[in-house]
A protein has these predicted regions:
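C-terminal luminal/periplasmic domains and tails of membrane-associated envelope-modifying transferases
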Residues: 5-237
Length: 237
């Protein structure tokens, strides 16, 4: 069967990332066992060199079986394909924010209804302008006044599956994040959807679009350092 075939192809010891890339770059079918943390940089090399890279087995938490062919009957289990697209995924709300010369936020949505005590998923579409520094994170929170907030903390971009230092101009990324809505700390009623991007633990990216206090699609920049913007409103029940 194909599993036995690719496991045999993966039996050669490859000590470095470059060795793995060269192994997969050949015309003959080739496979390799790699750590999950190596998938994104290897995928980036494959994209730049224009050779295929597939994940044949992602059942292990730490190790993946990758190959340069997709055998008959096999499915590509590459998690990067869940978050990286050539065209923008369609979400409920269109918007436009640009953070410096790195990335744009072009769409967003939350699962509704948003009910206190329940878990919901938020989604954001990003358009990459260039690679971002590693460790960059996103904030997508709901806010009513000073006290009622849902999901106030920054979290990893695109589930940490494809870190932003590997992005390239023209990439579209679908960011998903599941949120537990607090039962007691949040009041019912309309909440603003606020988006920002964090560069480091102590610094945020600055908004360059819109250039003023307001922009397309009813965007409103928070006063002050131009680090956060309101892109819309949702109801919390």
């Amino acid at each position: 069967d194909w599993q036995s075939y690719v496991l045999a192809a993966a039996s050669v010891a490859l000590a470095t990332r470059e060795a793995v890339s060269n192994h997969l770059r050949q015309q003959a079918p080739a496979a390799a066992l790699v750590r999950l943390s190596e998938l994104a940089p290897l995928f980036q090399v494959a994209r730049n060199a224009k050779y295929p890279l597939y994940v044949l087995d992602a059942s292990n938490r730490d190790v993946l079986l990758i190959a340069n062919v997709l055998p008959p009957g096999a499915e590509d289990q590459n998690p990067i394909r869940r978050v990286l697209f050539d065209a923008p995924p369609t979400l409920a709300h269109t918007t436009l924010l640009r953070f410096e010369d790195f990335v744009e936020v072009i769409a967003w949505e939350w699962d509704e209804p948003i009910v206190r005590g329940r878990e919901v998923e938020l989604r954001v579409v990003l358009r990459a302008l260039r690679p971002m520094p590693s460790g960059s994170k996103i904030t997508v929170r709901l806010q009513q006044g000073r006290l009622s907030r849902v999901n106030p903390l920054a979290h990893d971009l695109v589930e940490g599956v494809y870190p932003p230092q590997h992005w390239r101009q023209g990439d579209y990324l679908l960011h998903r994040f599941r949120v537990q809505v607090p039962t007691l700390e949040v009041v019912p009623g309309p909440h603003e959807v606020v988006i920002g991007l964090r560069r480091t633990e102590s610094a945020n990216y600055k908004l360059t679009i819109p250039e003023g206090d307001t922009g397309e699609h009813d965007v409103r920049v928070y006063p002050g350092q131009r680090e956060f913007a309101v892109v819309g409103e949702v109801q919390v029940w």
